[in-house]
Amino acid sequence: SSAASDVYKRQELTPRASKLLNVTAEQVEKQYMDLAIERKIILKQMEDQTQIYAASFYYMEANTATMLKRLNVSYDVSDAEIEQRIRGIEKKSGMTLDEHQVTAVKEAVRNGLLVITGGPGTGKTTTINTIIRYFELEGLEIFLAAPTGRAAKRMSETTGFEARTVHRMLELNGGAEGSGGFERDESNPLEADVIIVDEMSMVDISLMYSLLKAISVGTRLILVGDVNQLPSVGPGSVLRDIIQSHACNVVMLTKIFRQASTSDIIVNAHKINHGEEVILDNKSMDFFFLKRYDADVIINVVLQLIKQKLPKFVDATPYDIQVLTPMRKGLLGVERLNGILQRYMNPPANDKVEKEYGSTVFREGDKVMQTKNNYQLAWEIRTKFGLTVDKGLGIFNGDMGIIRQINDFAEQMIIEFDEGRMVEYPYKLLDELELAYAITIHKSQGSEYPAVVIPLLGGPMMLMNRNLLYTAVTRARKCVTLVGNEVTFQQMIRNTSQQKRYSGLCDRLKEN
């Protein structure tokens, strides 16, 4: 199973482990006791069953719960005072808030810990912007952060304030063997009065734990996210657990605003999320479904869309248009699609140097993606005259780039990642790089593209669920085109079975 659960149920783990390791159930049970004595695992009795935790996750969850509760202090500010200030901000900025958004601002002012959740078009950005302006008027120091570079960049664009990755805010120091230790922790906390973290659905338990260690009591923490996105790649489902535990105040934004209700991307995303029928008559301006039932036919349609139709339609380059697919393997999987798309978008040429690595050929001009967090890679942003404007460490899982140069002599590539970060990328790290003309929907989380194209033709039930479809559709700013079988599409909307993730954070938050 995926390592995304941080707790297992004994009656499920024992038969699975004994089958996997080809040993008897008794032998597995004996191991539990030995490991518990060595403090490698924790056995915890919950109601009628035993839960088994890796010790490191158990302590992380227990400490995360303790720290969250500690931050959850309340401040006494009157309704009238907050409302008066909101009205002033609305006047100045031309924004108007609905009652849910006003509630969110009030809760942010009155609580040390708050969760704000809502889908696309429900006014999260306006709410965050009002909260920022509010605390700014109080003269408070505000930090904005998001789990990925792309999400942080988006947050900067929508708020007009500098947002950083959580890693950068915590001052990543490379740590032992590049594991990524942070300069900021309980002995050197963040000097902020208010910290707002966006795209919380992507934050896993270990990043949450590191973040909380660096926040001192008296700092307000506001967590913003869309709980219906796919859960984080790493273990746990932090945002969902905090919401379900009722351990702190949560404001849910549900109303779709008028300007958003003309967008079928947003309207259909909410229909998918509620399990309602989506009309596929292609009368839309930004949501299309092209019915095709053969993998190769689908691929040809995808190629035409990227190269000819969509760039003009959304005013973007073919490189900006992202193909998102559910799977890695198979006729419409990432691996096969990348091979085909590469030939079509960046064909071989005499003046393009290539580097073969495993079954992939990397070529100058290729669109690529980093697939692991690498805390050691140095990057620089330079002006066109070669002056360094900014530099730093770390290229993270999901960062996209273009290969500008391949240098066999130096055994490295020059890759330009998002935001113009130039990296000397050594061949020995090519394991962490892959072509990115097509990427999995999971990898697209937290990113936004002018247009996305989603091939859909069957797939394993476990994977093809509502959250996956919802995440894919909400990646597009201007246009979503699905190409494939509408039956698969309808099945995904109906399939609400998410792979069950057990995690103990919700239980820990409910304790005492």
Where are these regions (language model features)?
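C-terminal accessory regions
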Residues: 389-392, 397-512
